[in-house]
């Protein structure tokens, strides 16, 4: 695997832009006051899956060829990655199966099914 080029990053941004709004970056005055610093928080919890991993799944599924999409996607996850792949698969009409470990958090399992 090679490192992505700057162009690869721009292409990925275009693929995911229709599905993920810009993530809010906010100041929190109480954190500033308590720390004596200027604290900025990037609120990934405002994304469709409430996690930054949504971008990777959307980019991956959007980049599949028609033949790859027809075969579907299989992945393994305990939560965030599975949610990302599930959402992206649903948006692009691709069949998806996510394997989870025995005893996985039921709330995470439900979120991946949603």
What are these regions (language model features)?
Residues 1-114:
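PLP-dependent amino-acid enzyme catalytic core
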């Amino acid at each position: 695997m090679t490192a992505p080029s700057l162009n690869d990053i721009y292409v990925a941004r275009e693929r995911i832009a229709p599905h993920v709004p810009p993530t809010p970056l906010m100041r929190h005055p109480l954190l500033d006051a308590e720390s004596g610093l200027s604290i900025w928080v990037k609120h990934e919890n405002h994304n469709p899956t409430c996690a930054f991993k949504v971008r990777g799944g959307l980019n991956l599924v959007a980049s599949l060829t028609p033949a790859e999409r027809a075969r579907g996607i299989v992945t393994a996850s305990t939560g965030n990655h599975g949610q990302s792949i599930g959402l992206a698969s649903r948006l692009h009409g691709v069949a998806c199966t996510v394997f989870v470990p025995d005893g996985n958090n039921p709330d995470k399992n439900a979120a991946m099914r949603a």
